[in-house]
Amino acid sequence: MSGPVDTAKSITKKRKRKHGGGARAATETDDAITRPAIENGAVNDSPEKEEDTKKSEKNGKDKSAKKRKVSHASSDEGDESQEEQGAPAQADGDSDDNKDDGNDQSEAENGDNGDKKDTESTDLPSAGTLSLPTVEGEPQKFTELGLSEKTLKAINDMGFETMTEIQRRTIPPLLAGRDVLGAAKTGSGKTLSFLIPAVEMLSALRFKPRNGTGVIVVSPTRELALQIFGVARELCQYHSQTYGIVIGGANRRAEAEKLMKGVNLLIATPGRLLDHLQNTQGFVFKNLKTLVIDEADRILEVGFEDEMRQIVKILPSEERQTMLFSATQTTKVEDLARISLRPGPLYINVDHRKEHSTVEGLEQGYVICEADKRFLLLFSFLKRNLKKKIIVFFSSCNCVKYHAELLNYIDLPVLELHGKQKQQKRTNTFFEFCNAKQGTLICTDVAARGLDIPAVDWIIQFDPPDDPRDYIHRVGRTARGTNAKGRSLMFLQPSEVGFLKHLKEARVPVVEFEFPANKIVNVQSQLEKLIGQNYYLNKSAKEGYRSYLQAYASHSLRSVFDVHKLDLVKVAKGFGFSTPPRIDIQLGASLSRDKKQQQQGRRSYGSQPHSKGLKFKRKHDD
């Protein structure tokens, strides 16, 4: 038995001579990275412990004190020396994402000697032994929360000092370990509300990579997940805990490798998270202490209800704190809260006392515009506001693709963002627009939820939202934060003015804007000529036209957005056609009620007489 120990000792001595004081940290890091890969983690490393004990006894107190000095010095000097000496790789793969690896190693070195339980397996001490700061009253500033110095330094670097209302009311109970169901407007500061308590918990329990995942944040869209990840990166910059992101469209194998190395704070979209929970061997999540479900209503709206139920069922529920945030409270959200939260959660709603459902500082308007003038008005508006930062919302991916191709072709540069793009393209576009001082982004509702895009001047709703909730989330992309200003404009056709009544009931204040006819640039004839001559634009325009009609037919507010009231000739002109093109369109169940009307002699919009089933051929005129 003594032979192997001597060999290990001699190897360690050689490493020490070669690398200096960081050699032990490097070996410990290698051990920490590989450990979770072995059957979810329970590995006994007591022989290594005995070896360290013998070594320290043999070398005496002076040498161990000297060793601690070297370790602390290396952590104080900065990141570079640690990176050279084998500092642990950050979960997201960026070398600069963990700026305090040195502190991590010195903490691990000092902490391992005092807490054998932590090094012997992936298990953690019970959350019941956790002591997080308790706050009395309602604090106004982050410095009054009793947070760790590392967290406060990161918050200060981010430029925050005073808390928003949702932060004041949620962070103290979350630090106390309560389950919270929070409701707040978009742009109110929810992200820090759940990340600060999560990071404090990870730090207090001294999570290491080998302990696996302690916090999971579930987000409805990839872009929102990337945004939360960016905030987490800033918040964790002085902490030693690892963090990562798993989203659909990204490299699954690379994600699995990071999870096996150990990701303490994980941001994820539901589908990819469930995939890893079920199929990634070595993904340690038995130590999960906090589950955050952000934009819960949106997660359920986009069809992830089954996935969320499975995720909640798979994750350990004992000692788990759950935070569920939702801008709107629906029956489905209440059902999810019932299965995920512990009995007696704290319900926090910061909006119910407000006069309006949208943020202050937001000027909201609408314009009544015929279908054939909609594109001309949009073109004129964008031309006059080239120096502004604008987001334009459309109802379908094909509408976005067509208008992006058209506007870029006629030298009005725009960026596009929609669900049919590859993930890398979506990510690049999102960050390019975030960093831009001016420009136009045209997109579907994939960008309507939670995204914090700086300094947006105008939100244009070219196609109407499905309901007032979607309207609120769309306009929430501007006037974000304290004292911020922004403006929104919604295009409505004369047949759609009934939507204003629904907005009024939802406490959304809108006023009518007027655009003088002589200010609208009339490029209709040039547009029709271009669409008639350019094969690719013509094909794209047809797809956009077809998708627009499909989206319109599937509107939830059928009483307002009645597809039968559309003037197809005018709609077609808006897409650059002199006469409506002949297209095949599958409307599915959304028009099942129209079958009876057809049988009673009423033709569906633009359909040929005696058409069978739900396939309609468009005519030029009705």
From Swiss-Prot:
Keyword presence, RNA-binding: yes
Biased composition (Basic and acidic residues): 51-63
Pfam families: CTE_SPB4, DEAD, Helicase_C
CDD domains, alphabetized: DEADc_DDX18, SF2_C_DEAD
Protein name: ATP-dependent RNA helicase has1
Phylogenetic classification of the source organism: Eukaryota, Fungi, Dikarya, Ascomycota, Pezizomycotina
Stretches with biased composition (Low complexity): 598-608
Extent of Polar residues compositional bias: 122-132
SMART domains (UniProt xref): DEXDc, DUF4217, HELICc
Keyword presence, RNA-binding: yes
Short motif (DEAD box): ranges: 294-297
Annotated motif Q motif, positions: 140-168
Enzyme Commission code(s) on record: 3.6.4.13
Organism for this UniProt entry: Aspergillus fumigatus (strain ATCC MYA-4609 / CBS 101355 / FGSC A1100 / Af293)
